[in-house]
Amino acid sequence: MKINVLDEQMQLENPELAIGRITKPVILEIWNGRQKDSVIRREYPYTRITQTENGLKACAEIEDEWVGKTEVTDVYCVEEGSVVLSRQVRILKESEYPGIRLRTEISLFPERKNNFEELRYFAPPAIYDKNDLDEDGYEDYFHTKKIIFRDDRFNYPMFTCYSEETKEAVSIERDPLPAFDSNPVRKISEETGEKEAFFLQKTDIGSMGADGSDGSTRLTCCYPFYEGDATIALYIVKMVPFGAFWPLRSGEEFTVTYRISNHKYENYHDACWYGIRDIIRKTHPQAEPLSVPPE
C-alpha cells in the first residue's frame, strides 16, 4: 500500500486500485451538553502537509467558536504493507462547549461499487456479513446501514470489509490496543428523564465499523466511542445513540492509532479466516488465569 495526496484528500492505494480515500481529513464532533440535537459536526482541511521518510505528516491548526484553539496532527506511515495512521488532538484554548470527539472516515473502493449492499463485513462476535438473514440489505437487529460498535465489543478491535467485485479486503484495527477505561458520570437528564446517553469521559475505548447510510460505504472510527443510531448496550430498553466525548478544556490532549491493511482473497470466507489467523500469529494470545474460582 501507498499514500497519495489528491487535492487535500488522502488516498490509500495498492498497485491495482484505490482501496480507500479520506475525503474529509479532520472531522471533529462537538458536544453542546444536551441529549437531543446535541452533536455539532465540523470539518476542516489540513493547513500543512510534509513528507517524511516513510509517509506523511499533516497538521490542522484550528481556531473558531466551536473548538476554541485546537491542533490536530496526523502521521501516516507505510509499515509492513499497511498504512499506520496516528492521530493526536491538542486543546490549546477551550471554547464554550464541554466535549469533543475525533472522527475518522475512509471511503472504501471509491472508484468501484461501494454501497452498503455490495460489501460484506466481519468483526466477531458483533458482525458476520451484515447480520442480514432476510437479505433486505439492512442489518437485521437494528435495520440500519450504520454498524459502528465500541472497540471492546469485538474479540479483537478490528473491522474488515470485503468486496466481491474486486476480491479485496480492507481492515482497520487499533494498534496499539486500547490501554485504559473509566467509569463515566451519567446523570439523570432533565430532557429525557433517564441516564445520559451522551456524556464526558476520558477513555481509550473508541468505536469502529461501517457507515453506508448515504449510498456509499465508509470505514468509520470514533474516539472516544460512539455507537451509531442504536447500541447493543441499550437495546434491551430502547434504540438510542450512545457515546462519550473528551473534555474540551485547555491543556487536554489525546492520541489514537489505527492500522489499515489490504489483502486479496478468493472469497469472503477466506478473508474472515485468514484475517483472524494473521491476528493470532501477530499477537500470540495467552489464556489469563481467573481472578476468582469459577464456583
Listing of model-derived features with the role each one plays in the protein:
Residues 1-250:
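Beta-strand/loop-rich accessory regions of lumenal/periplasmic or secreted enzymes
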Residues 245-272:
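Short Pro-Gly-centered flexible turn/kink motifs
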Residues 265-295:
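An acidic-aromatic substrate-binding cleft motif
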